[in-house]
From Swiss-Prot:
It comes from Arabidopsis thaliana (Mouse-ear cress). The lineage of its organism: Eukaryota, Viridiplantae, Streptophyta, Embryophyta, Tracheophyta. It is found in: Cytoplasmic vesicle, Autophagosome membrane; Vacuole membrane; Cytoplasm, Cytoskeleton. This is Autophagy-related protein 8b. A lipid is attached at residue 117 (Phosphatidylethanolamine amidated glycine). Ubiquitin-like modifier involved in autophagosomes formation. May mediate the delivery of the autophagosomes to the vacuole via the microtubule cytoskeleton. One of its GO terms (biological process) is autophagy. It holds the Pfam family ATG8. InterPro entries: Atg8-like, Ubiquitin-like_domsf. PANTHER family: MICROTUBULE-ASSOCIATED PROTEINS 1A/1B LIGHT CHAIN 3-RELATED (PTHR10969).
Amino acid sequence: MEKNSFKLSNPLEMRMAESTRIRAKYPERVPVIVEKAGQSDVPDIDKKKYLVPADLTIGQFVYVVRKRIKLGAEKAIFVFVKNTLPPTAALMSAIYEEHKDEDGFLYMTYSGENTFGGSFYC
């Protein structure tokens, strides 16, 4: 985990309170933290916290990440949840329910390489 990561920068109690407040106010949305993998050569993302519609697919969210980092179409990007590549067609709500952290946020990491050796799902 990076030194400037959201988890290291904010105590657990604060993160839990924030995610609880967000989920109560926006029940149809998923609180997501997106951070670049440590050694990746892709650009840094301009913001880490996202409030994503629950019915958005992983593939649609990857598109959002690509736009935020201004990555050209010729470059690949991989988004990981707990070091695995989630299925592109999976809904963010399903991935959130299965992989949310104890603090109530879903943590995702992006990279220009398939750094964790995960398999692809189409």
